[in-house]
Amino acid sequence: MSRGYPENNNFLNNNNQMVLDMILYPLIGIPQTINWETVARLVPGLTPKECVKRFDELKSCGSSPVDNQYNPLMATGEGPVETLATYIKSSLLDTQGDFQETPVDQDTVSKAGRHSIATTRNCSSESENCTARNAGEETGESEGPNMVIHVCDEAKSLKEDFICPRDLLISEMKYFAEYLSMDAQRWEEVDISVHCDVHIFNWLIKYVKRNTKESKDCEIPALEPGNVISILISSEFLKMDSLVEQCIQYCHKNMNAIVAAPCNMNCINANLLTRIADLFTHNEIDDLKDKKDKFRSKLFCKKIERLFDPEYSNPDSRNNAATLYRCCLCKKLLTRETERRIPCIPGKINVDRHGNIIYIHIRDKTWDVHEYLNSLFEELKSWRDVYWRLWGTVNWLTCSRCYQAFLCIEFSHCQYHSEVVVYSSTVNSLNTVGTGIYPCCNQKVLRFDPTQLTKGCKVRDHMVVLHDQGENDDSPSCPPAKILDDLHKHKDVIAVPFLKDAVSDPGVGSCDEKGLEYEILLEPNTPWGSKTGELNAFLSLKNWTLQLKQQSLFSEEEEYTTGSEVTEDEVGDEEEIAKKQRKKEKPKKFTKPPKKQLSSPCSQKKEKTLEKSTSRDVSPFVVSMQKNKWDASRSLRFNQDAQREDDQRRMSEITGHLIKMRLGDLDRVKAKESKEFAGGIYSRLEAQVRASVPVTARQNSSDKNQRSKSRFGQGRPA
């Protein structure tokens, strides 16, 4: 050991280095090229660069430094040594001469890494011997060079090295494909370090080598409830697609055992959670026995997200919530599919060209779906209940009793009367042949009701007969039978109690005639009927359709006019025409009304409806001529100026409307504020500041402003 190599004492203490010296010593003096890749495979843990370096040291020395120390081991006979030398010369020499020694400039393998390889191999000798034997003999040329992976387990303070052929590592763990280049000169420059649980990575390496020859001696690993989550996360990071799919399928089949095992499921990312949730039906998630709620709420949250995905074909729901909104009239939550089936208030009923009744809902712009979900969670305290309530909101069925489509949340809202309607056979002062009375609540009803709205004083559960419904073609993946079954299973969460709302259900529980005024039922003081309340059904229906036409035209005028033009409802009345003529005769200057008054059609609508209630049926329905028409009695310049002003006004209105469409929060802010400010938020803040200032201070400031204005007016030349 004292032949001029004191720095190599530690180097020779390792058995691997002693084996390397025994392999390299017979190669000294041979002129043929040495295949250093094959030499490195014989000694696990060493690179071709280290073998070249050690070979140069042995050539400069002239003799092996292990002769004296290991001569007793070789003194038994010359046969093994000669056999080893013969094998080395035959297998390690490159007879073709194609491979040349490549100089390596960078030292990429640290000494700490080599020390870790040696120590961990001593701890797990059985598995490493199996790996080293197969890596050196069987995987030689077919699977590429062996790659050493340093695994650091900080939680257990363990370090271990694993060896795997490069080609097999790239094909199974695609994460390393971008780091392990196909260039042979860079194979020895790569140092792989993985921070992972040692046992989990050992499981992964065994899975990678499951189809190799060495797997015959090693046991093929199996998934367990205690390790499947860790393996799933690690395999997803290493891009082991086949193993990820196996883990997801295992989680679907054994979720009850997994949630009962002591494992952390918070590390599952959104992508894996979505793939797992897609395998579950909502009934399977509901049946999970998750006492600590480690995973069930997350699955229900993913199901809620899927309900809002318009491109996802949901096997649990026939409709999605992507177009969910609230009607500002009937206050019902509707989608694009349910809005044409669920009735609104009687004033928004229309008839299509085929004679079918259609419902027109108006979207409530102040309603926000995120606030709705948060309020549902605050009310129900569980994402499971939130999902079932939302599922019942977007799905519908048809009742075989009332023949009306209903939302699943309104399952217990089937209105009916406990007694049969009684129609009078004789005409008297209180009734006509076309009307009847329910004795249970004294509610009056038409014999032929064109609205086809269900009305009753009591409610019960809807009855659904599946063979009577023609809805099986709407969603083949989720038939009505499945929806009805899910509705019965979770009725306590889905169904909401019935509320006697005067807007949506005015006929329920009301015994007076005011609750029945739908513009189609009884109106006691109608001008065309008798004073005692006699009703003509045909005239009532005619009046109702005329009113709908007027309302539609009125709504269009509200939306596209500023209020300065003459409305169509004011022309048919002779009193209004006389008033306008008197106004024209008065020598008053024309002043344009402010926009603040023009932008409040609600008050105008109330006043106009009061005026129309007494005169809408006396005079015919006439559409008025607008003021912005060309006036032949005026001069050309006047008409051109008027047209230019009208175009400017119209463009300003279009600009304002586009701004409101772009800033959708404007309507929400206006709805929350009791007072509107034309100047926007700055005007509102100024009003708040002025309201907070004492009255005396405001009076003093106003006096000062008036004095300053008067002085400024005096100093200005006339």
Curated annotation (Swiss-Prot):
Compositionally biased intervals (Basic residues): 580-595
GO biological process, one term: isotype switching
A GO term, aspect molecular function: identical protein binding
Bias kind Basic and acidic residues: ranges: 604-615
UniProt family annotation: Belongs to the KIAA1841 family.
Protein's job: Negatively regulates class switch recombination or isotype switching in splenic B-cells.
Name of protein: SANT and BTB domain regulator of class switch recombination
Organism annotation: Mus musculus
Protein's gene: Sanbr
